[in-house]
Amino acid sequence: MDKGEDEQGAYHQDLIEQLKAPLKRCTNKCYCKCCCYHCQLCFLQKGLGVTYHAPRIRRKKIAPLDRFPEQKQSISTRGRDSQTTQKGQEKVETSARTAPSLGRKNLAQQSGRATGASD
């Protein structure tokens, strides 16, 4: 039984030495389960995503350019064709004045009866 205990003790010591040994560079770039767990370095880098190298340099974010600068003009005069839109508005206003809608008074005049009176 001493032989079995000695082998088991030697096995444990071997495992501890492997853990304390410096990590060797692994050139395997596969991320399958078998390759992620085949050595301690691959487990740390591929399995857990832990890397101990200098972080990559990140560019500073540049302030966004003013795409819509504040304009001192009113909203109605900002458009490209401000003159044509004003002409179009005048046409709409004149057409509304020339063709009044039929209301209660106009209906009464057309029918010849007073509105609201019943026979």
Swiss-Prot record:
InterPro entries: IV_Tat, Tat_dom_sf. The keyword RNA-binding applies. Coiled coil: none annotated. Pfam families: Tat. Gene3D superfamilies: Tat domain. One of its GO terms (molecular function) is RNA binding. GO terms for cellular component: host cell nucleolus. It comes from the Viruses. Residues 71-87, 107-119 have a biased composition (Polar residues). Residues 61-119 are annotated as: Disordered. Residues 43-53 are annotated as: Core. Interacts with host CCNT1. Associates with the P-TEFb complex composed at least of Tat, P-TEFb (CDK9 and CCNT1), TAR RNA, RNA Pol II. Interacts with CCNT2; the resulting complex is unable to bind to TAR RNA. Belongs to the lentiviruses Tat family. Transcriptional activator that increases RNA Pol II processivity, thereby increasing the level of full-length viral transcripts. Recognizes a hairpin structure at the 5'-LTR of the nascent viral mRNAs referred to as the transactivation responsive RNA element (TAR) and recruits the cyclin T1-CDK9 complex (P-TEFb complex) that will in turn hyperphosphorylate the RNA polymerase II to allow efficient elongation. The CDK9 component of P-TEFb and other Tat-activated kinases hyperphosphorylate the C-terminus of RNA Pol II that becomes stabilized and much more processive. This is Protein Tat.
